[in-house]
Regions:
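Conserved active-site alpha-helix within GNAT-family acetyltransferase domains
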Residues: 109, 117, 125-126, 133-152
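Intrinsically disordered, low-complexity and often Lys/Arg-enriched segments
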Residues: 1-6, 168-187
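Conserved beta-hairpin
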Residues: 43-66, 76
């Protein structure tokens, strides 16, 4: 089954019913139901939802916002390739959750791939995507997709955008990524 074809991913609006969403993480569920729309309105973050195309129910979500990563927090091999600014621009994947009814089917990877493509296509300089894994299982999930731990940071991982795109789509130019290639990011 092609998981990506079963869902449309779109920005969160007031039309999305969040009341029944249950991921198994009380803090993520509470955030999604009570805070996500306020953060989006305040432009603190942008929230995207995966909506089941048959039932129109929300099956997952993620948030993106801007952040900076101190240059000396990056692995030395990465840091030496960058300008010697105090920090490099990054996108923070703040939250990612999948409803229990859809867990284990690959939707988390599809959401991650969508976040990477949206970040790469943004018309601003972003070197990497950064995530703060909430636990060891989340850390392993991100590591499967190429994220690496930042030295000295507990569960903060990063993935250079160009690396993600090159590995999944065969190009580091997001404008050249086809919809089919975009679905492969996160697989």
């Amino acid at each position: 089954m092609n998981v990506a074809a079963s869902f449309r991913i779109e920005p969160l609006t007031g039309n999305h019913d969040r009341s029944q969403f249950l991921s198994g993480s009380a803090s993520l569920d509470r955030y999604f139901r009570e805070q996500a729309s306020q953060d989006t309105k305040r432009r603190v973050t942008t929230c995207f939802v995966a909506v089941d195309i048959e039932t129109d129910t929300v099956a997952g979500f993620y948030t993106l916002s801007a952040c900076g990563v101190p240059l000396n927090d990056l692995p030395p091999g990465l840091a030496k390739k960058l300008p010697h600014y105090p920090a490099v621009p990054a996108a923070l994947l703040g939250r990612l959750a999948v409803d229990r009814t859809c867990q284990g089917k690959g939707l988390g990877g599809v959401l991650l791939g969508d976040a990477l493509v949206r970040t790469a296509r943004a018309e601003l300089g972003v070197f990497a995507m950064v995530v703060d894994a909430k636990d060891e299982a989340a850390q392993r999930f991100y590591e499967r997709f190429g994220f690496t731990l930042l030295p000295g940071e507990a569960r903060r991982l990063c993935l250079p955008i160009a690396t993600a795109l090159q590995g999944a789509a065969g190009t580091s130019n997001p404008a050249r990524i086809t919809p089919k290639q975009a679905r492969n990011i996160g697989k």
